[in-house]
């Protein structure tokens, strides 16, 4: 079962929303993931990455949009993330999360100011958003798995507003399985550990990596 982040659940702020404009700044995207269901395009994630930062912007067909900036450590894990969720109606919600060795600290931006939430963790912790395959790719690369190996993470689920245990299994040299509460992703990987595409099981979404022209 997922654990709520303190008494200040991120999900309550995501539902309530904050009116405003996303403050996340990004560099020009170099790649994208196209998400489809049958012949329909469900969404697009534009992203870019250097050694220190990951930038991502997600546009869904429903009108929902996410903007993400993650600061990366030398081992490819995430040290800090800023995420903004913007609805079709222009309602914006912001969250900032720091990932320490044993503590995840979140700051939630609300109209009357900011609130703090913390959760103690054992082992590695990271952000997770099921529709951000750039973040999923970051998790795969930070796990440093060989063929047949697996790793467990405590993830702060940005969409659900809780924490949960996530497992990454390197099934074959060119594939991996990511599973957590109510989410299962089957990934096709390159030799460099990049996600080439895959399937969101249950939703029956397919996603494919493409270059931005």
Where does each model-flagged region fall?
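Bacterial N-terminal signal peptides that target proteins for export
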Residues: 1-10
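Boundary at the C-terminal end of the N-terminal hydrophobic targeting segment
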Residues: 22-27
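Solvent-exposed helix/loop surface patches that form functional interfaces
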Residues: 28, 40-41, 87-180, 192, ...
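Short, small/polar residue-rich loop motifs at catalytic or cofactor-binding pockets
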Residues: 28-29, 65-66, 181-183
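N-terminal mature ectodomain segment of secretory-pathway/periplasmic proteins
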Residues: 31, 36-108, 193
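Short, exposed beta-strand-loop hairpins at the edges of beta-sheets
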Residues: 186-190, 194-203
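Short, basic/aromatic-enriched C-terminal tail that caps enzymatic domains
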Residues: 204-211
């Amino acid at each position: 079962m997922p654990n709520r982040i303190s008494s200040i659940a991120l999900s309550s702020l995501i539902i309530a929303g904050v009116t405003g404009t996303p403050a996340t700044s990004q560099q020009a995207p170099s790649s994208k993931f196209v998400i489809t269901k049958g012949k329909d395009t469900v969404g697009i994630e534009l992203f870019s990455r250097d050694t220190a930062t990951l930038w991502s912007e997600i546009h869904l067909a429903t009108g929902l949009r996410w903007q993400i900036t993650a600061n990366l450590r030398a081992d490819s894990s995430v040290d800090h993330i800023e995420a903004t969720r913007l609805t079709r109606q222009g309602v914006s919600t912001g969250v900032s999360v720091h990932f320490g060795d044993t503590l995840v600290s979140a700051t939630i931006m609300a109209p009357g100011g900011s609130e703090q939430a913390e959760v103690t963790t054992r082992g590695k912790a990271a952000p997770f958003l099921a529709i951000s395959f750039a973040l999923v790719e970051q998790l795969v690369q930070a796990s440093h798995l060989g063929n047949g190996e697996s790793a467990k993470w405590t993830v702060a689920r940005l969409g659900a507003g809780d924490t949960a245990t996530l497992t990454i299994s390197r099934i074959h040299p060119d594939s991996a399985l990511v599973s957590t509460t109510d989410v299962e992703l089957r990934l096709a990987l390159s030799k460099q550990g990049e996600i080439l595409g895959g399937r969101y099981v249950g939703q029956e979404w397919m996603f494919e990596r493409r270059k931005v022209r």
